[in-house]
A protein has these predicted regions:
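Catalytic glycan-binding domains that act on GlcNAc-containing polysaccharides
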Residues: 1-166
């Protein structure tokens, strides 16, 4: 698993499923730390400088510069604080977190309000931006694949099976 130590550290500290972080990272940058979007988002988790500045001091980087977002440790640490805030805001609902991460918090809140609280499976259908809807579906598929491959400590299920058979 690429960036396993950084992902696990952040996931444990912020109570985020590490496999969700991997799913988000795969979709955002295909695990390329040097990725840069046309909108200027940078690094593994494609943070914009403005968003990163909101969380940089809490992450221990009060003098953050835009180029720092290409450093995997910094990018993951800042994104984790942001994602943890979104998880709290959306009551642990990962689909809404992904929608917010891509389409904005206000939009995700609006889409969630149109969803029956007892039927959150309908949430993705309520997403008003085709790009964000597609993004959420891809992130959640990535997340489910990582849940099939790894436990919460990112240990491969197949490796554990091999160890047990020895």
């Amino acid at each position: 698993v690429l960036y396993k130590n950084e992902v696990l550290l952040c996931a444990r500290n912020k109570k985020i499923d590490a496999r969700f972080l991997l799913g988000l990272m795969k979709q955002e940058s295909s695990f390329r730390s040097n990725a840069k979007s046309p909108a200027g988002a940078r690094g593994l988790l494609q943070l914009t400088y403005d968003t990163a500045l909101k969380y940089s001091t809490a992450a221990g980087y009060p003098n953050l510069q835009p180029e720092d977002l290409y450093r995997t440790d910094i990018n993951i640490a800042i994104a984790c604080i942001y994602i943890a805030e979104l998880l709290k805001k959306f009551d642990g609902f990962y689909e809404a977190v992904a929608a917010s991460y891509n389409g904005g918090e206000d939009n995700a809140e609006r889409w969630l309000k149109r969803t029956n609280p007892n039927d959150k499976g309908v949430f993705v259908a309520e997403i008003g931006f085709p790009e964000t809807k597609n993004y959420v579906l891809k992130v959640m598929v990535n997340y489910q694949i990582y849940r099939q491959l790894y436990d919460e400590n990112l240990k491969s299920y197949s490796n554990r099976m091999q160890e047990k058979s020895r």
